[in-house]
Amino acid sequence: MEQGMNDMQGNMMNSNMEETMMPYYNYTGYTTYDGHFTQDYDFVRALKYDNVMIDGYKVNTATNDKDVSTSKKVNDTMVDMNKDGQVVNITFDTKADTVSKAMFKEAHMSNHMSDEGQTENGSYMTYETNNGMYTAHFDEQGYLMKVMIS
């Protein structure tokens, strides 16, 4: 009986430990070097959990002030901040003609797509995250051009 109780406590501890481990992804460098990281399973899961860091910056999805006050370019990434210096958007370019819309859609199918449409020079797909969203922009040939996390 005592062994069963220890097993149960051990399973509960393991369960609690698994719940606290949130997926994360940290990208440092030029995002235009190789756009395939946008297809990485860990990147997709980290997006869902609002836990992606690009060049040392991560969107603060908890802030209520989403108004952009300043912007900072780091490598080929644009970081938008509110008046308090909290990151509200991160936009990064990707390598041209590398990731097709179909490839992106397949890699991100575990996340909820909330919008899809056309732009003047291509198309876009917007996905919901736990507390925010991200939008992928595609050129007229259907290749990923940039991603905006907010």
Per-range role (PLM):
Residues 1-17:
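Sec-dependent signal peptide cleavage junction
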Residues 14-150:
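A cross-family detector of function-defining hotspots
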